Amino acid sequence: MDAWRMDPTFAMCEALVDGAELSSLAGGPFDVRAVVAGVRPETKDGFLLDEVPWTHFPQGDRVREAVHLLHTRDSPVSDGTGVVGGMCANDMRAAAALAVPFLIRIATDARHPHRADALAETSSPARAGHFGVASRKELLLHRGDTRYNDDYDDYGVEVTGYPAGWSVTAARAAITADTALLQPLLDDPDPIIRIDAAYALATATDRDHSVRTAFRTRLAAEQDPIVRAALVLATAEATRAHPHPATTTWVREQWRDRTQAPEVCLAAAIGWLCLTDGAAPNDLRATVDHLATDERAHVMEALPWMVFAGGSGETGLQRCVRTMLHPELPEPDDDPWALLL
């Protein structure tokens, strides 16, 4: 706590607690959205880390050091990406958002030994409030406006008092700025890279639908069922953020198509439920209840959406099915008879 009180951002957060208007700080040196937008392309490509004001944000010096070590390959991966992921898990994303452009460049370096780990962490600052979330309303929801919003949004504040929506918006803007670097990773030989590229790209602002088109293009060539499932979920997430009725209809066709792999049908069913608000049709219920076996639920843990949706002893798929289709059932920890079975 003493270290945090010495942090330059502490005065900003203290002022907010004391009643200062958030809008009065927008665009200033402690607005991570403005800082990310101001990072020069040459700074990103050349890893000129000293040009980035890391210390303007909580634990920024740790993030800068982690990016440096990861870039130079001088540390175990846990000392690099682990810092970014750990801070996001602890609800501190502002400095982590500054790392996003550099993590993307590490991920696109085919010779880097930790590129997969860097890519897996790229979207961590771009998501918040998603641990254990498996409802139709919230699973694929982008709670904040990706445009500048100088007031608090549904993300609220981080544990430091910093506006969480600013951090998320900054991270998504960084991903959006580098979609041209990320999209080729959808064709990477490594299926884990393809999955995590889709997961990261799904957070991008996609008003021209180019990202969604890239998902559909890759899907036409993709043979791996679990990667196909990832592409369907990514398409649904992008469509949730930028509605497109024709794509919603297409997602419905995927879970109705009996020639699709079970993982694809399940991903499409979940995605379609998140894109609509009517009662789940009987044929969808029957399809999901038939396909959502325990074995398949564990297979689908390869999808980051499912990893973060899980909780209370349930896999992500199990939690989604219960929450979306069987809300009358209690959570495992809330079932007083569970220990007797």
Language model features with spans:
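Short inter-helical turns and helix N-cap capping residues of alpha-solenoid HEAT/ARM repeat scaffolds
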Residues: 73-76, 110-115, 189-191, 222-226, ...
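HEAT-repeat alpha-solenoid elements in large eukaryotic scaffold proteins
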Residues: 71-84, 150-160
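Acidic, serine/threonine- and proline-enriched intrinsically disordered linkers and terminal tails
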Residues: 112, 119-182
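Extended, charged low-complexity segments
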Residues: 243-341
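N-terminal "cap/leader" segments of large eukaryotic alpha-helical scaffolds
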Residues: 2-75
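Structural detector for internal amphipathic alpha-helices that build alpha-solenoid repeat scaffolds
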Residues: 20, 24, 37, 46-58, ...
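Amphipathic alpha-helical scaffolding segments comprising HEAT/armadillo-like alpha-solenoid repeats
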Residues: 60-68, 90-106, 131-139, 175-185, ...
